[in-house]
């Protein structure tokens, strides 16, 4: 089996001192199809059949979610930083491993798969799931490329987050 982790580069002190950044750029450049295949395999055929659309979190989540949406014939929903989507939007503040932000999405309906690149502290995933529900969606599943759980106290009261790679 292909070791996708070997294509991820560790960058110390980025984007700020004390952060170890997992750079997925080499993985996407060299093994994009295999990466999407690994993410796709996190759900079985029955689970995929229940998903109406795939929500990708800005910005690397867009890359993964849009490719999955194309592969599975699903809609694609943007979850963006504040001020990047035209109204109407629903917004929610959230915490990052190195700051604060506000996520927004346009209102809608349907059953969503949430996709992001990394599970670190869980702040972005918690906010995205809550935001999606406020915007009118039902969250069925959540997947990430990398699970690096920086917060050992991370709690998720939904179906488990599935990850292609664990650190």
Stretches with model-predicted labels:
Residues 1-50, 106-108:
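Active-site-facing substrate-recognition patch
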Residues 4-7, 126-167:
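PRPP-dependent phosphoribosyltransferase catalytic core
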Residues 49-58:
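Short glycine-rich phosphate-binding loop at a beta-alpha junction
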Residues 51-52, 110, 140:
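Conserved acidic residues
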Residues 56, 114-115:
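Generic enzyme active-site microenvironment
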Residues 63-72:
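Short Gly/Thr/Asp-enriched flexible loops that form oxyanion-binding sites at enzyme active sites
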Residues 74-113:
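Short, glycine/charge-rich flexible loops or terminal/linker lids adjacent to PRPP-binding catalytic cores
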Residues 116-129:
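Acidic, divalent-metal-coordinating active-site segment for phosphoryl/phosphodiester hydrolysis
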């Amino acid at each position: 089996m292909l070791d996708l982790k070997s294509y991820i580069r560790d960058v110390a002190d980025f984007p700020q001192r004390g952060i170890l950044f997992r750079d997925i750029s080499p993985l996407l450049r060299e093994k994009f199809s295999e990466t999407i295949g690994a993410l796709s395999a996190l759900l079985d055929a029955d689970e995929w059949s229940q998903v109406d659309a795939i929500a990708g979190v800005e910005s690397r989540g867009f890359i993964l979610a849009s490719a999955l949406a194309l592969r599975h014939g699903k809609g694609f929903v943007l979850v963006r930083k504040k001020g990047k989507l035209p109204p109407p939007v629903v917004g929610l503040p959230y915490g990052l491993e190195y700051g604060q932000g506000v996520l927004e999405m346009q209102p809608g309906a349907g059953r969503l798969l949430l996709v992001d690149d990394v599970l670190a502290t869980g702040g972005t995933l918690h906010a995205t799931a809550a935001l999606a529900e406020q915007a009118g969606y039902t969250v069925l599943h959540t997947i990430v490329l990398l699970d690096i759980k920086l917060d050992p106290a991370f709690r998720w009261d939904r179906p488990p987050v599935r990850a292609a790679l664990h650190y």
